Structure formats: C-alpha cells, structure tokens
Amino acid sequence: MAKEDMIEVEGTVVETLPNAMFKVELENGHQVLATVSGKIRMHYIRILPGDKVTVELSPYDLTRGRITYRFK
C-alpha cells in the first residue's frame, strides 16, 4: 500500500497496552488500537497516556493504526 493512501489523524493516548500497543482516542471521538512505528521505536521515544500523537490509519481497517509522531 502506498503511503499516500494512509489517513493521518491526531489523537490522544488513553491507555498503554502490552507489546507497544496503545489505545488512542481520535479528535472525532473514535478509539483505535495503535502500535508504534519503527522510527519511534528505534529512537526510544517514550509514549505515555495523555500524549498527543499523529496516527496513520489504513482505509481498509479503521480500528487499527500506527503512531508516527508524538507532539512535545
């Protein structure tokens, strides 16, 4: 899948789950299950509940996503 096909939305981390998974509440009120992208994992960027993040969603499954950026 091409990167242009991904849907980028902002949200807030609600809960941390095992295996680097997070429950993220999007700005529109929906909750998605998100994992950490490789670059964030590689640079040891910590993500905690309450952090504002950018999530990439696939148009095929809008319930799962990938965290690509954590706002400071």
Swiss-Prot record:
One of its GO terms (cellular component) is cytosol. Residues 1-72 form the S1-like domain. Coiled coil: none annotated. One of its GO terms (molecular function) is ribosome binding. Keywords: Cytoplasm, Initiation factor, Protein biosynthesis, RNA-binding, rRNA-binding. It is found in: Cytoplasm. InterPro entries: NA-bd_OB-fold (IPR012340), RNA-binding_domain_S1_IF1 (IPR006196), S1_domain (IPR003029), TIF_IF1 (IPR004368). SMART domains: S1. Belongs to the IF-1 family. Component of the 30S ribosomal translation pre-initiation complex which assembles on the 30S ribosome in the order IF-2 and IF-3, IF-1 and N-formylmethionyl-tRNA(fMet); mRNA recruitment can occur at any time during PIC assembly. One of the essential components for the initiation of protein synthesis. Stabilizes the binding of IF-2 and IF-3 on the 30S subunit to which N-formylmethionyl-tRNA(fMet) subsequently binds. Helps modulate mRNA selection, yielding the 30S pre-initiation complex (PIC). Upon addition of the 50S ribosomal subunit IF-1, IF-2 and IF-3 are released leaving the mature 70S translation initiation complex. PANTHER family: TRANSLATION INITIATION FACTOR IF-1, CHLOROPLASTIC. HAMAP family: IF_1. This is Translation initiation factor IF-1. It comes from Enterococcus faecalis (strain ATCC 700802 / V583). The gene is infA.
